[in-house]
Amino acid sequence: MADYIEINSERLCDCKKGYLSCVEAREWMKNQIGVWNFNYEPRDVRDKTVHPAVFPIGLATRVIEQFTHKGELVLDPFCGSGTTLVAAQDLERNCIGIDLKQEYVDLSNSRVDNEKNGNPCKQIAVCRDARTLSEV
């Protein structure tokens, strides 16, 4: 196991410096109010026997879009089934997922491998304890 993970975190977008994300201000404000509704899509893991805490890709997508720019790094310290990694890949964000169980790390990495779409960003899950982030 490597001592460190090398992964880029530089912006790939042309957004103005100081902007929180690539989302336009009006859209960003609209997303701060009310209740978010999401429909499941075929790529979503819905089976609670696969992982007890599954959620739609759309939820991870919304949060990542709201708070990051293309090319930046997303950290999921409890990656489970890898939904955040899939959303990060869709949005051209780098992502590191961490989980205690190797079976979930394998599931996460296989979902990302299955979703390759040619973007320049990297998504990877590792089997570690999130309490030791400085060692990742």
Give names to the regions the model predicted.
Residues 1-136:
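Class I S-adenosyl-L-methionine-dependent methyltransferase catalytic core
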